[in-house]
UniProtKB/Swiss-Prot annotation:
Keyword Coiled coil among record annotations: no
GO molecular function term, any single one: structural constituent of ribosome
Name of the protein in question: Small ribosomal subunit protein uS4
Alphabetic keyword roster: Ribonucleoprotein, Ribosomal protein, RNA-binding, rRNA-binding
Region (Disordered): 28-52
Family: Belongs to the universal ribosomal protein uS4 family.
PROSITE patterns assigned to the protein according to its UniProt record, in alphabetical order: RIBOSOMAL_S4, S4
Presence of keyword Ribosomal protein: yes
Function: One of the primary rRNA binding proteins, it binds directly to 16S rRNA where it nucleates assembly of the body of the 30S subunit. With S5 and S12 plays an important role in translational accuracy.
Length: 206
């Protein structure tokens, strides 16, 4: 499964969840709560197999974070080999990706936009430019927008919007200085994800 580059709204309709985690996409899903295409409203009448349910759950989570199959499986295998609850550890590893942290801090409006900002060199980690979206953020790391990028229209708009939203509890954010700190790992109850990670564990354990 490669990284999806088409319409995030259309893919969200197909998966049945708001993959962009934006109000705009959610409003669209509320109006059209069925898969795209001429047969979208008639889908889902047959009972899916256990395999297809688990495959779909894996695809939903991978697409939510914008991770390709190789990266996704590598992270899962890492999570399965460290102490702790595998599903929670797996989600924490996904949350620690730099592109995701940039999104959580509100510097970008979507994870896709966050990947672009990181790749184009607009993001600093502890004062140093990092252009790798999969870079793993550590507890205590300070993430900021490069000074020369703070005047960009998109980033200005994103930070104004973030001031009206609740900041994730594992993050400290100073919108006025375009700076945030990753203060702790998120607990499972912190993550309001419409995902059953146990299905993903079962998928890879088959």
């Amino acid at each position: 499964m490669g990284r999806f580059r088409g319409s995030i709204t259309k893919l969200s309709r197909r998966e049945g969840i708001n993959l962009a985690e934006t109000e705009k996409v959610q409003k669209y899903l509320d109006r059209r709560p069925y898969a795209p295409g001429q047969h979208g409203q008639r889908r889902g009448r047959g009972r899916p197999s256990d395999y297809s349910v688990r495959l779909r759950e894996k695809q939903k989570l991978a697409r939510l974070y914008g991770v390709n199959e190789k990266q996704f499986r590598n992270l899962f295998e890492e999570a399965a080999n460290v102490p702790g609850v595998t599903g929670t550890v797996f989600l924490q590893l996904l949350e620690r990706r730099l592109d995701n942290v940039v999104f959580r801090m509100g510097f970008a409006s979507t994870r896709r936009q966050a990947r672009q900002f990181v790749g184009h060199g607009h993001i600093l980690v502890n004062g140093k430019r990092v252009d790798i979206p999969s870079y793993r953020v550590r507890i205590g790391d300070e993430i900021s927008v490069a000074e020369g990028s703070r005047s960009m229209g998109f980033i200005q708009e994103n930070m104004e919007a973030q001031k009206r939203r609740r900041v994730s509890p594992w993050i400290e954010l100073n919108p006025d200085t375009f700076t945030g700190t990753f203060v702790r790992l998120p607990a499972r109850e912190d993550l309001a994800l419409p995902i059953n990670e146990n299905f993903i564990i079962e998928y890879y354990s088959r």
